């Protein structure tokens, strides 16, 4: 906090005029200054003096100057000021809350001594410190004072704790006493050395500023915390002290100075702030801190008052609210538009970290580290509650006096002005429309306050809780989801609307619900009333009295209701009509009537009713006022109300009551309404008889209580009360009661009284007389004597018959042993159960007839379900069935029908029952019944009517043939198609196997989603193509979003991007590129987007995505330099040079060198222009640019020109340019390297004289090393001698040029070959020169020239060897073929070795493919080697290497790779490979679960071998044929098992395949094959269960043999009439896991004790096992589908056969359950058989 001088309030005087006290009001609107002239100046909130009044002496006789003002303080409500004076009096002045109120003394407390200090902690209590040492308390209401405690030392200061829990008093002797309000005890906590005149009580203890220039801090227990000592500084004694409203800051005043101390929560101690120096202020004797904490008023000894601004910092919110932090925990918010101020204070002392303005700028939210503060700027109330904010809370300010905080499913209610939450609930439904809260304002009386919350527990349940006690008041369940709720102002009623727009009103106290409207678009309570306004269509409905929801007022409107507005004069509904807003005025008088009742203003309500007598609901309103008046004891108003509605009885009654009250008022005083008879009679009027009884009995007025009941004819209550009270005239009362009953004909009631008195016989007679025979019978049965009296019983029986109570009469006759009459009356009374029960022992022959009659009776009365059993008992099954059908007991009806012997009758009923099951949806049972009844067409029509076309097709095919069915159903499908019933048409098309027609249908009508669905299901390979086609169509139609979706689903995002690019919808193109195309595509589209818009927009776009630099680069790369310049100019001027250089580079590539040079220069890269011209040998331009822009490059230009001159051999020009470039060293080095010694010496002497001697020395060494002229001389000599024709000397000179004379290999080779040419031309007869030439040629490695010389010399072999050394293989071979043919193989061998050593495989393949392949294999390049072998089109060669590679892979255990190799290059029929094929098969079939893909691959390999062996007619053909059949059956079964057993045909096909596999157990895993076959047979059903038992039993034998390692333990005798092998190799371990093995073992053991399971195979008509191919006639061909023998219904498929039914089933399964594996099986079979599969008719 900082202190800053603000302004002068009161100017200082020339002499002493001490300001004795300054006090600020708690509401912050006023400040009072006690001046030296005994007047009090009043300041407003801005520090401007608004008023002044003069203080009074204790008595006017003492004069105005007889006292001084010693102390002063404001009351807690800021409306009064207490002033303590030296003349032993304390005055309290009422100053009011406005400036125009008169200042009057309202309290005067005369004290025994002067009042030295004051504190006013409570409205009705004030603390007074006196000169005599007493601390007293003044009671404002009684105007009396009493002493709290007394000391002997003057009280110099009193300070109250900020929380008003205690206070301290400081005394002249330095002692400080702490007084606790709750315990009413005081204790001395410390004693100072000097009087503690300047004392404040803060939240953190006491702060005392003493006259010895020290500031001390104490705890509440009197322990010193801190001490600030200013004795060593230029400080004078402290004269006053003040604490801010938050008790976090303290200001201490002295001479010309204010010192500030602030509490540090982090340190837990006081920190001293910067002091404020005020020149010429002198001693500051009074301080007052304004309650908003922003300003301190300081009064001086000279009468001056100035203000000091104290704040931490200032700020602005929303450019409207000025924030002033006067403390970390205190912020003043000022609205600059109207200058209103709001305090936001943390009462916990926590720093306010953040402020937010919400709720239409009315509410302020302050956040601290652990709490939240909510302030209402209009009511100036704020609340603080504990809160840990995550930043996700929401605030609802739509409710009066409170707000709601929504956070993480919790709703917290906060009442303004009350710290802490009012309550909270948990709910996920937190919309403001689903919450309603009513909290009464502070002006409402405490007992009338309402605090309730209504919320939704779930979408259909409303809960209402009382926030005062936290109890749930109501729990409302609704049938539908609720979308709006609201409580009325008194929270007595709730309105809610559900999502079906039905509005319901709930009375919370009675839980009574009333539906107001079934459809409502707007509903609302009228503000400040219980009137409801709702809109339904063009009707506006108003309920002025919600207690009578049926009374509604309607008016027509022409728009939608927007709001309901109310002021003092009128209430209007604002309706938005088509052209304008219209206000519809409501009946404000009726609204006022409700308000009057709410305020209990009965006179006003009666006046309203009297002036509105014509209302339709006047009667109910009079009743309402009357009842409320009675409830509140206003009898005259109640009488007036009843008179208005002509209720004469109540008017008279009230008249009587009023007379009694008037009489009572004379004796008991008051208005007499408290007299007990008045209260009792009012209770009787309200039908509260028990309360009236209580009132009478409380006064011992028994007669009146009993008389009340008898006058009301409540004799039972009168007798009961008389009996309880032992009323002496009880018997007489009872007699009077009986007489009254007899007079009024209430014999039955008299009989009850007789029964209670024990006179049963009289009671029976009375019951019979009153025609209540049942009561008479009950009374007789309860009397042991009368229950045996035959006469009495017959009288009762006759009375029962007369009353037509026949069943009861039958009971009586049965009791009298008169069974005929008993049965007769039982029948008459329809008590057939009792009749039959009686007839079973009395008349057994009548039982069946009675059952039949009972059934007919039940049928007559409609109890058909009960009649069924009785018809059955009567053996009338037809009637039983009909009754069961009429009772809709269909299972019972069906069971009865099945017991009817007549087939014709039974069939008729089947049809009717089937119709029921059809309608019910139990189609399977209905089908069975229809078929049973022979109603095949009805069954088919049933399925058709219910769109179950598959079942309809199945039945139609079964009963009408397949061809006719397909034809009719195709026509039906087309008809459905034509009539727009596409879903049914689709189902039919698919059922008959024509999904393409369904696709065409949907495509024709534009139902693209259905097209895609069917294509995906039946033609998945065309899915992407179809999506692209649709996308193109959508694009053409302009539906780009749909086109985008299809492009993306087709995986063609580029087309989607291009589509949006073509449409210039760049944002969409960019979105797709970003999400689908990756970073490069994203950038590319973004840059093209920028290119399309250009300018500032392009720069903004690229900057938005952080791609400006990349955009410039992209523009340059794509040649869009105009865009690049724009982007660089607008957004990146530093890149302009780069763009110029990039453009120059492109221009250079295009040959536009002049333009390029300009851009190089503009790009600040002239050196690149120079280099460009140098590369182009444009020396003039290079020199020009270098001179103009970069002279440092001129030497490079000249050097380049020199280099060009050297290349052209122009040494003089080169020398000139190098000298211009100032580089003589380069030309010197050039002359030396080229042994141009004279020129070198010249340059050195002229330009590099320091090197001249060195060059001269080198020149001499060179001459010495090369003889006269060195090698050049030999060349010159040879040329000269050659010209002269001296060939020998020429050759000799040339041969001298060798490695001894020079290192120039080219010169040596040239000279040697020249010498050889001369020898061949002129010296062939001279062997010496020939030899010398050959030696030189060999030394110079000129083998080809040597071969030429040797060939001329006749040395053919040596010539050929020379050509081989020269790698001239063709020439060598040509020479060999001509001169030495025997050397040709040797040459070829050498050639191959050369190719091999050099790795030249391409050439080696052409020469020796075997060697080349072997080289590849050595390098582990098997794929390349096999491809090379395959390219030779020689199968044995390929088979050889395939077998070799396969063997290696097998050794590596890489069987998957073996399969891949065999699939790629084919499997050969070489027996050497058979072990590999066998291993592949064993390993694949050894896995726990068969994998179709792996089995299919092994099967395909075996097919290749099979075909090869078949062509060769190999002896191994049969072996591979069996293996292939086994693999084929396993693969087909595996593919079918993927579908599951849901398709019946699949299970049968899999079973047959499993049984067929038994014949291959000698090459398969025997225990597995037997187990799978046995399990399949067992699961199929009873037909094959015995076979399953046999096979599984054999499987167990095999497992036992495996465990024992002895194959002889297995018994094969059950398989004699089959082709199942009897000798199989046992595996090393069992295949099945132990758990399943044990399960199957238990089943076999359990089945072995069942005689139904015989150990035998299933035989066919051949007399052999049905899966066996062999029989007595020979061997049958196996079926391609099942492996079963094909005996009849043969279908020929290429070279193989299939059984017709099985083939058709298999193909139907493929069509209806198409899978990739089934299609693969179909293709394999077609390939194997050599013909495609097709359904056979």
From Swiss-Prot:
Main localization category: other
UniProt repeat feature WD, residue ranges: 14-53, 63-103, 110-150, 151-189, 191-229, 233-273, 511-553
GO biological process terms, semicolon-separated: cilium assembly; dauer entry; intraciliary transport; non-motile cilium assembly
Pfam families the UniProt entry points to: TPR_IF140-IFT172, TPR_IFT80_172, WD40
Tissues and organs where the protein is expressed, per its UniProt entry: Expressed in amphid and phasmid chemosensory neurons, where it appears to concentrate at the base of the transition zones, which correspond to the basal bodies of motile and sensory cilia. Moves in the retrograde direction along cilia and dendrites, suggesting that it is retrieved from the distal endings of the cilia by a retrograde transport pathway that moves it along cilia and then dendrites, back to the neuronal cell body.
Record's keyword terms, sorted: Cell projection, Cilium, Developmental protein, Repeat, TPR repeat, WD repeat
Cellular component annotations (GO), alphabetically ordered: axoneme; ciliary basal body; ciliary transition zone; cilium; intraciliary transport particle B; non-motile cilium
Assembly mode: Component of the IFT complex B composed of at least che-2, che-13, dyf-1, dyf-3, dyf-6, dyf-11, dyf-13, ift-20, ift-74, ift-81, ifta-2, osm-1, osm-5 and osm-6.
Official protein name in the record: Intraflagellar transport protein osm-1
Organism expressing this protein natively: Caenorhabditis elegans
Organism phylogeny: Eukaryota, Metazoa, Ecdysozoa, Nematoda, Chromadorea
């Amino acid at each position: 906090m900082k202190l800053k001088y603000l302004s002068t309030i009161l100017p200082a005087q020339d002499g002493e005029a001490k300001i004795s006290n300054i006090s600020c009001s708690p509401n912050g609107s006023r400040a009072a200054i006690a001046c030296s002239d005994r007047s009090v100046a009043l300041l407003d909130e801005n520090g401007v003096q608004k008023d002044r009044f003069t203080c009074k002496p204790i008595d006017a006789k003492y004069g105005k100057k007889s006292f001084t003002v010693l102390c002063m303080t404001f009351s807690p409500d800021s409306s009064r000021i207490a002033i303590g004076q030296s003349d032993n009096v304390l005055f309290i002045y009422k100053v009011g809350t406005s400036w125009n109120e008169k200042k009057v003394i309202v309290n005067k407390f005369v004290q025994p001594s002067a009042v030295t200090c004051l504190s006013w902690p409570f409205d009705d209590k004030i603390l007074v410190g006196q000169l005599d040492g007493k601390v007293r308390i003044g009671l404002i209401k009684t105007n009396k004072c009493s002493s709290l405690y007394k000391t002997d030392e003057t009280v110099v200061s009193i300070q109250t704790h900020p929380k008003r829990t205690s206070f301290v008093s400081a005394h002249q002797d330095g002692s400080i006493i702490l007084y606790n309000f709750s315990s009413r005890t005081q204790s001395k906590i410390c004693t100072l050395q000097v009087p503690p005149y300047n004392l404040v009580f803060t939240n953190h203890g006491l702060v005392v500023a003493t006259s010895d220039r020290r500031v001390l801090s104490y705890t509440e227990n009197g322990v010193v915390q801190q001490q600030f000592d200013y004795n060593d500084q230029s400080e004078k004694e402290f004269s006053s002290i003040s604490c801010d409203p938050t008790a976090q800051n303290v200001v201490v005043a002295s001479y010309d100075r204010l010192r500030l101390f602030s509490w540090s929560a982090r340190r837990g101690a006081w920190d001293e702030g910067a002091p404020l120096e005020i020149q010429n202020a002198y001693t500051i004797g009074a301080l007052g801190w304004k309650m908003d904490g922003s300003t301190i008023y300081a009064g001086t000894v000279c009468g001056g008052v100035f203000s000091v601004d104290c704040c931490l910092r200032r700020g602005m919110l929303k450019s409207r609210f000025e924030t002033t932090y006067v403390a970390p925990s205190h912020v003043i918010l000022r609205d600059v538009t109207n200058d209103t101020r709001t305090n936001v204070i943390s009462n916990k002392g926590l720093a306010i970290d953040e402020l937010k303005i919400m709720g239409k700028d009315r509410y302020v939210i302050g956040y601290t580290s652990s709490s939240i503060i909510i302030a209402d700027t209009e009511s100036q109330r704020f609340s603080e509650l504990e809160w840990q904010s995550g930043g996700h809370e929401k605030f609802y300010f739509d409710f009066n006096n409170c707000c709601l905080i929504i956070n993480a499913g919790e709703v917290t209610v906060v009442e303004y002005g009350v710290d802490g939450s009012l309550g909270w609930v948990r709910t996920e439904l937190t919309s403001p429309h689903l919450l309603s809260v009513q909290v009464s304002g502070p002006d409402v009386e405490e007992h009338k306050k309402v605090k309730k919350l209504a919320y939704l527990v779930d979408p259909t349940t409303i809960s209402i809780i009382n926030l005062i006690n936290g109890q749930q008041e109501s729990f409302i369940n609704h049938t539908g989801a609720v979308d709006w709720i609201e409580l009325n102002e008194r929270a007595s009623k709730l309105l809610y609307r559900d999502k079906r727009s039905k509005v319901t009103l709930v009375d919370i106290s009675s839980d009574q619900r009333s539906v107001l409207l079934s459809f409502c678009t707007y509903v609302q309570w009228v503000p400040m009333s219980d009137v409801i306004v709702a809109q339904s269509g063009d009707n506006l409905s108003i309920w002025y009295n919600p207690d009578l929801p049926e009374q509604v007022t309607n008016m027509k409107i022409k728009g939608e209701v927007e709001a309901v507005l109310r002021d003092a004069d009128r209430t209007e509904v604002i309706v938005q009509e088509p052209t304008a807003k219209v206000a519809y005025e409501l009946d404000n008088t009726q609204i006022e009537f409700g308000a009057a009742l709410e305020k209990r203003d009965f006179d006003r309500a009666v006046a309203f009713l009297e002036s509105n007598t014509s209302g339709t609901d006047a009667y109910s309103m009079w009743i309402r006022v009357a009842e409320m008046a009675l409830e509140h004891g206003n009898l005259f108003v109640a009488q007036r109300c009843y008179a208005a509605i002509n209720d004469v009885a109540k008017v008279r009654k009230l008249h009587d009551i009023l007379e009694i009250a008037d009489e009572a008022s004379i004796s008991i005083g008051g208005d007499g309404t408290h007299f007990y008879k008045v209260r009792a009679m009012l209770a009787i009027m309200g039908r509260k008889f028990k309360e009236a009884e209580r009132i009478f009995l409380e006064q011992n007025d028994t007669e009146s209580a009993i008389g009340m009941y008898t006058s009301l004819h409540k004799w039972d209550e009168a007798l009961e009360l008389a009996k309880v009270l032992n009323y002496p005239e009880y018997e007489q009362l009872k007699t009077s009661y009986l007489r009254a009953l007899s007079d009024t004909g209430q014999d039955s009631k008299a009989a009850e009284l007789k029964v209670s008195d024990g006179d049963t016989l009289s009671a029976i007679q009375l019951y019979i007389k009153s025609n209540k025979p049942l009561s008479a019978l009950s009374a007789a049965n309860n009397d042991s004597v009368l229950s045996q009296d035959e006469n009495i019983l017959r009288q009762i029986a006759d009375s029962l018959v007369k009353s037509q109570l026949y069943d009861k009469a039958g009971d009586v006759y049965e009791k009298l042993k008169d069974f005929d009459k008993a049965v007769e009356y039982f029948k008459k009374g329809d008590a057939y159960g009792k009749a039959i029960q009686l007839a079973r022992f009395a008349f057994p022959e009548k039982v069946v007839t009675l059952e039949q009659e009972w059934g007919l009776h039940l049928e007559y009365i409609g109890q058909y379900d009960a009649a069924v059993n009785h018809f059955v008992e009567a053996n009338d099954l037809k009637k039983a069935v009909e009754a069961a059908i009429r009772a809709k007991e269909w299972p019972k009806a069906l069971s009865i029908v099945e017991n009817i012997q007549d087939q014709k009758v039974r069939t008729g009923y089947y049809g009717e029952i089937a119709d029921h099951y059809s309608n019910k949806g139990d189609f399977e049972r209905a089908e069975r019944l229809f078929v049973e009844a022979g109603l095949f067409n009805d069954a088919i029509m049933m399925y058709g009517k219910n769109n179950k076309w598959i079942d309809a097709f199945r039945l139609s095919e079964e009963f009408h043939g397949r061809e006719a069915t397909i034809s009719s159903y195709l026509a039906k499908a087309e008809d459905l198609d034509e009539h727009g019933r596409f879903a049914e048409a689709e189902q039919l098309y698919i059922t008959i196997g024509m999904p393409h027609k369904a696709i065409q249908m949907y495509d024709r009508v534009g139902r693209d989603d259905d097209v895609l669905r069917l294509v995906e299901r039946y033609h998945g390979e065309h899915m992407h193509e179809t999506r692209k086609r649709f996308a193109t169509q959508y694009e053409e139609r302009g539906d780009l979003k749909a086109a985008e979706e299809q492009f993306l689903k087709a995986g063609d995002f580029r087309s989607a991007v291009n589509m949006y690019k073509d449409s210039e919808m760049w944002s969409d193109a960019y979105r797709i590129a970003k999400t689908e195309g990756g970073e490069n595509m994203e950038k590319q589209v973004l840059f093209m987007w920028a290119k399309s818009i250009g300018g500032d927009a392009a720069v903004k776009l690229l900057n938005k995505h952080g791609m400006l630099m990349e955009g410039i680069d992209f523009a340059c790369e794509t040649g869009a330099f105009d865009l690049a310049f724009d982007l660089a100019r607008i957004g990146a001027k530093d890149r302009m040079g780069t763009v110029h250089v990039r453009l120059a580079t492109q221009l250079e590539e295009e040959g536009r060198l002049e333009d390029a040079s300009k851009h190089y220069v503009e790009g600040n890269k002239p050196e690149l222009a120079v280099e460009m011209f140098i590369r182009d040998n444009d020396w003039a331009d290079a020199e020009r640019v270098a001179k103009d822009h970069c002279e440092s490059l001129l030497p490079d230009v000249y050097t380049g020109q020199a280099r060009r001159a050297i290349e052209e051999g122009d040494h003089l020009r080169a020398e000139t340019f190098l000298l211009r470039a100032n580089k003589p060293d380069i030309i010197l080095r050039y002359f030396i390297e080229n042994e141009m010694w004279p020129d070198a010496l010249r340059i050195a002497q002229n330009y590099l004289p320091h090197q001249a001697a060195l060059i001269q020395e080198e020149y001499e060494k060179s001459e010495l090393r090369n003889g006269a002229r060195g090698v050049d001389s030999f060349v010159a000599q040879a040329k000269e001698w050659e010209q002269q024709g001296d060939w020998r000397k020429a050759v000799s000179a040339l041969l001298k040029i060798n490695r001894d004379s020079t290192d120039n290999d080219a010169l040596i080779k040239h000279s040697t070959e020249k010498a050889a040419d001369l020898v061949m031309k002129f010296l062939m007869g001279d062997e010496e020169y020939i030899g010398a030439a050959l030696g030189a040629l060999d030394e110079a490695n000129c083998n080809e020239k040597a071969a030429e010389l040797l060939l001329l010399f006749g040395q053919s072999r040596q010539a050929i060897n020379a050509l081989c050394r020269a790698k001239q293989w063709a020439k060598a071979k040509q020479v060999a073929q001509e001169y030495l043919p025997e050397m040709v193989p040797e040459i070829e061998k050498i050639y191959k070795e050369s190719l091999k050593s050099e790795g030249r495989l391409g050439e080696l393949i052409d020469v020796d493919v075997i060697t080349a392949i072997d080289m590849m294999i050595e390098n582990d390049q098997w794929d390349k080697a096999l491809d090379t072998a395959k390219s030779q089109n020689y199968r044995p060669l390929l088979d050889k290497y395939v077998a070799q590679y396969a063997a290696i892979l097998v050794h590596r255990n890489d069987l998957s790779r073996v399969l891949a190799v065999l699939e790629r290059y084919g499997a050969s029929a070489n027996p050497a490979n058979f072990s590999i094929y066998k291993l592949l098969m064993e390993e694949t079939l050894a896995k726990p679960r068969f994998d179709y893909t792996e089995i299919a691959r092994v099967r395909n390999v075996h097919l290749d071998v099979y075909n090869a062996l078949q062509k060769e007619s190999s002896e191994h053909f049969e072996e591979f044929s069996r293996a292939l059949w086994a693999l084929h059956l396993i693969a087909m079964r595996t593919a079918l098992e993927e579908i599951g057993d849901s398709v019946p045909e699949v299970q049968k096909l899999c079973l047959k395949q499993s049984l067929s596999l038994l014949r291959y157990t000698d090459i398969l895993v025997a225990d597995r094959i037997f187990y799978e076959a046995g399990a399949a047979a067992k699961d199929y059903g009873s037909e094959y269960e015995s076979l399953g038992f046999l096979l599984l039993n054999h499987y167990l034998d095999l497992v036992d043999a495996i465990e024992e390692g002895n194959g002889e333990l297995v018994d094969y005798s059950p398989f004699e009439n089959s082709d199942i092998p009897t000798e199989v190799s046992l595996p090393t371990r069992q295949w099945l896991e132990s758990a399943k093995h044990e399960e199957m073992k238990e089943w076999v053991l359990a089945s072995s004790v069942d005689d139904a399971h015989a150990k035998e195979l299933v035989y066919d008509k051949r007399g052999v096992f049905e899966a066996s191919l062999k029989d007595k006639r020979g061997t049958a061909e196996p079926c391609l589908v099942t492996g079963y023998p094909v005996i009849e219904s043969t279908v020929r498929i290429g070279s193989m056969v299939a059984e017709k039914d099985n083939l058709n089933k298999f193909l139907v399964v493929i069509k209806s359950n198409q899978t990739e594996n089934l299609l693969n099986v179909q293709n394999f079979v077609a390939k194997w058989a050599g013909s495609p599969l097709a359904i056979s008719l």
